[in-house]
């Protein structure tokens, strides 16, 4: 009987801890959306990229702005350096060790570069979709 109670309480504590983590992460995501929704909407009007897609990718790539890359380099989309990139650089392990990522002065600059990045020919088919077709964009 005592061991069953111990198992039950352990399980209950685990569930409460998990619930708190999910709630905390949800709060972080809501804060991220509140902070950057106007930026994403502006980019949508300028570049025809759905704001929901921009926000979703920023949330996933940056952990709602909490990742080391977002905090140290204002890079919310995991955009890496290219051969022609002349700006500041931030290095961290990713797919490979010590990869080079772009550094931005502000998060908003990162959002703009994300829009410009999606204008590359590789993503041209996305722009054939309606801006309201978020499933197609995803």
Q: Can you name each region flagged by the protein language model?
A:
Residues 1-24:
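Bacterial Sec-dependent N-terminal signal peptides
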Residues 18-138:
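Catalytic cores of secreted/periplasmic lytic hydrolases that degrade extracellular macromolecules
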